[in-house]
């Protein structure tokens, strides 16, 4: 029997389905990614403008070059020390050991990995700079009824406090800004 995916989590419109010409329904926003450029505070690096990323050793999440916009893409296009990787588990140690100047990650993912790697109370060792506006996340489905069911459930847990408990459980403290 052919397996079919009912739901995917995505932050880009129809990014998995646009070539198939299939109607895709997007849910309400589940949470926002807070993409930040993060460096060691003690290094006092300057990277307030996009062109500042052209000469730094940068480790970013996979597809950052596309997600972070054309100005960022231009800045890192000729940077031989720019890397994108799916595995964000290594980035905390790479940054802490000064093997990279900057990592680009959702702040909440970084903080979670930081606590797992280096223990609690280390977030103050780093500087967090906003690189783009928050990125809304939602689910995508080919089934309108499934989307509506999901939205009703999401609304309910947001209203009854369960949503906030989930954020705290999995992200310790969900931080909505860099």
Regions found by a protein language model. Give the residues of each.
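Short helices/loops that flank or line small-molecule/ion binding pockets
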Residues: 1-6, 88-109, 116-117
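Extended ligand-binding regions for polar small-molecule ligands
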Residues: 41-63, 136-174
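Periplasmic-binding protein-like
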Residues: 31-36, 120-151, 155, 174-178
């Amino acid at each position: 029997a052919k397996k079919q995916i009912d739901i995917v989590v995505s932050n880009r419109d129809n990014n998995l389905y646009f070539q198939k010409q299939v109607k895709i329904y997007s849910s309400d926003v589940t949470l926002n990614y807070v993409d930040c450029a993060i460096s060691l505070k003690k290094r006092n690096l300057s990277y307030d403008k996009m062109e500042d990323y052209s000469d730094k050793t940068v480790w970013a999440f996979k597809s950052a070059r596309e997600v972070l916009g054309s100005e960022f893409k231009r800045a890192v296009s000729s940077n031989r020390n720019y890397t994108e990787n799916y595995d964000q588990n290594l980035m905390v140690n790479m940054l802490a050991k000064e093997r990279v100047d900057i990592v680009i990650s959702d702040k909440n993912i970084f903080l979670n990995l930081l606590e797992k790697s280096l223990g609690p109370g280390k977030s103050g060792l780093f500087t967090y700079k906003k690189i783009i506006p928050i990125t809304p996340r939602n689910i995508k489905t080919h089934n309108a009824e499934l989307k509506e069911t999901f939205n009703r459930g999401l609304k309910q847990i947001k209203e009854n406090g369960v949503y906030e408990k989930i954020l705290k459980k999995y992200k310790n403290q969900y931080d909505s800004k860099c």
